[in-house]
Amino acid sequence: MSGGKSGSRLSAYSHLKEIGKGGFGVVYAAQRENGEKVAIKRIDKKVPKNRVWTEIQTMKELKKSKYVVEFYEDFVEDGYTYIVMELCEGGSLQAYVREHGALDDATAVHVLRQLISAVSFMHRVNVIHRDLSAGNVFIKDSKKKKMTVKLGDFGLATTLGRGETTCTIVGTPGFIAPQVYDQEYTQSADVYSLGAVLYTMLTARNPPPKGLPPTCGMSPNAARLVEQMMDTDAKKRIPLTQIVLSEFMYENTNENAVIFSREHSRDGRRQRSREPVRSSRDDRSRDGRALIRSSSQPAHSGRAPLSNRPIHDRMPSTSSRGFDSERGRERDRDSGRGTVPPSREDRNRSQLWPIRMDRLEGQRVCTAGGRYIVELDTRCRFEVAAQGNFVKRILIVEVDEMVQTVYVHRIPDRTVRGRNGEEELITLTNNPFVYTSYSQMPKEVQNDYMRLQKMVAVTISGRVAKVTFRRPSQFPDAQAQLMENGDLRIKLPRSVIVRKMDNGEIFNCIDGIATQKQAVSGITLTKVNEVYKYLIRFEQCLNGMDRGMVCFPIVFSAGTNMVGSSPSSLMPSGSSQTSRFPFSNLSNNQPSLVPHSAPFLTKPTSSQRASSANVQRRVSTDENSSPSVAPSKYKIKIDPTTQKVRSIQATDGRVLRCSTSKADQFIFTDPAIRPDDQRFMRTDRVPDRASEMLHTLCERMRKLHQ
């Protein structure tokens, strides 16, 4: 195909070569006048114009996602519609596995994580792909274990909510959810298709048109995830947001994981090798690098599968190992310390990627190596200091629906000095390096990331109380706190008893000074372990609540008959519930937050009882206060003349302004993501990270007009 007539839009492209052909048109590789390689899709004249328009609008809408084939431009010549887009020279994922064979588990997980990010972005803007298959996943970079892919071909995509959205049979056989054939489907159909793509990556074969595909030859966790994603019952199908929590994803994101090699016999059947192949990180670990031998990455863990954990509380339970195990009882007898929970290594391993920051917002720590700040429950930063207290780079870690992205902003040498905890944030650069997995990062960034992860998981989490038990019967003049990192603190009038989670060590800090430690023994040791066991079980009960209920942090007090009782026996039940387990009503204006769906809480039978069963969550108390926490997350500016709200600014530099030229238009600036302003109407899709600011701004405007 030639580049078109002189002077035409198509003539600006040369070296056109056909690289693909489908029912709706032909795709060419081409070259721009500046030498840039692109892909050009020529859509057949017979394709309905509304479908062409939908594909173009969808690509424009998804342009912000880095895992979607980027849209450049479109034009019409001689009745044909041309779409110019990013060229992925590696071809389709389907063609790649046919030529090179199945991917190993680690590479498949790396690709799946990118596709989850792309589909999550699509669903946030209410788009269903409807033809998500291995043939529509294109390879940008096929380097081993770092394969970069892009999702493309949105010719069948549609917006959720339109008349024909859930009642049209489209897609590629084998990748189509059963609900599509029934002409009743939602976004979960894309999850089924993602499962089919995962199956193709692991087997180099397309799944059968109907029924669950055979999973022989896969690792057990891989087979389990494929079955969960391709469950024929949409209601039982694993949600998109929980795929990253599966054991298969976890074990192949952690660099110490075993990767199963796959061999193909002459008849094409795949067999699992008897010898496990260690990831490249295991090979690197032999040279003695400190990063590889970090205590936060043990080779083995006794934790429960992530897929079995409640999603509503993303911080792992401090009680993921059973207390009645034989080995635990032996430790109890030998040490006299009582129950020994999972080690800090186990917890840090589960928090390596993504970093879990729930309920840690506002915490700051300054050290000689830099400043650590948890800006939001989904965003933290590390301002890395070099010699002379000059900042050399800033790591920003953001978690969106359990998909984590790391932005690295490099600061010119000796231009910015480190700041104290109370001082304002350092301005970020406009062109950060972006990483979506641990293995992508260079060694120096990996070291910085591990320092940040350890600071959040150990030090900062140890400052925030998750459960506060006021006046336990063992220590009537004290309060016991189970911290976010699993430590126990019992605050007495003149001292603080601490029980460390990682090694079970128990000591008493006189006057709260860590250097003045005293050993704890005898009856006091027994009482400490009783309180600890009780709080662990209490936390377990709360973790069993409905997924939509966020219960932590929680503050409560109990009666005097707690010793030897289980949490469930002490919770309200029957006519005596008021006197047996009264939750402290910390605020007279706080409505009852007792979740009626909790397995161990009973709905009060009268208003009198309800007043004694009030639970306050997310309270601002001394337990969770930090001297560095800002009094407010946002700063609102009001025009002194008109008394109208002009803008709202977040502590991390984001600014949302009201447009002065057009009513109901807003201007959003997010220097951490992009330097330019984003304008949008109130009825448009709100940019990422602006939703909460817009809600706060509108609420303030509404109150001013009352």
UniProtKB/Swiss-Prot annotation:
Q: Where is the composition biased (Basic and acidic residues)?
A: 261-290, 323-336
Record field: compositional bias (Low complexity): 566-579
Q: Name one GO cellular component term.
A: nucleus
Coarsely, its chief localization is cytoplasm
Name any Gene Ontology BP term: activation of mitotic cell cycle spindle assembly checkpoint
Locate the region Disordered. Answer: 261-351, 566-632
Query: In what way is this protein post-translationally modified?
Result: Probably ubiquitinated by the SCF(sel-10) and SCF(lin-23) E3 ubiquitin ligase complexes, leading to its proteasomal degradation.
Q: Where is this protein found? A: Cytoplasm, Cytoskeleton, Microtubule organizing center, Centrosome; Cytoplasm, Cytoskeleton, Microtubule organizing center, Centrosome, Centriole
Residues reported in the UniProt entry to bind ATP? 19-27, 41
Catalytic activity entry: L-seryl-[protein] + ATP = O-phospho-L-seryl-[protein] + ADP + H(+); L-threonyl-[protein] + ATP = O-phospho-L-threonyl-[protein] + ADP + H(+)
Impact noted for substituting residue 41 to M: Loss of function
Provide the active-site residues from the annotation: 131 (proton acceptor)
**Cross-referenced InterPro entries:** Kinase-like_dom_sf (IPR011009), Plk4-like_POLO_box_2_sf (IPR047108), Prot_kinase_dom (IPR000719), Protein_kinase_ATP_BS (IPR017441), Ser_Thr-PK_POLO_box_1_sf (IPR046437), Tyr_kinase_AS (IPR008266), Zyg-1_PB1 (IPR040733), Zyg-1_PB2 (IPR040734)
Q: Where is the Protein kinase domain?
A: 13-249
Give a Pfam family name.
Polo_box_3
Keywords noted in UniProt: ATP-binding, Cell cycle, Cytoplasm, Cytoskeleton, Developmental protein, Kinase, Nucleotide-binding, Serine/threonine-protein kinase, Transferase, Ubl conjugation
Record's compositionally biased regions (Polar residues): 580-592, 603-629
Give the EC number: 2.7.11.1
Gene Ontology molecular function: ATP binding; eukaryotic translation initiation factor 2alpha kinase activity; identical protein binding; protein serine kinase activity; protein serine/threonine kinase activity
Q: Which family does the record claim for this protein?
A: Belongs to the protein kinase superfamily. Ser/Thr protein kinase family.
Q: Give the multimer and partner information.
A: Interacts with sel-10.
Recorded protein name is Probable serine/threonine-protein kinase zyg-1
- Origin species, per record, is Caenorhabditis elegans
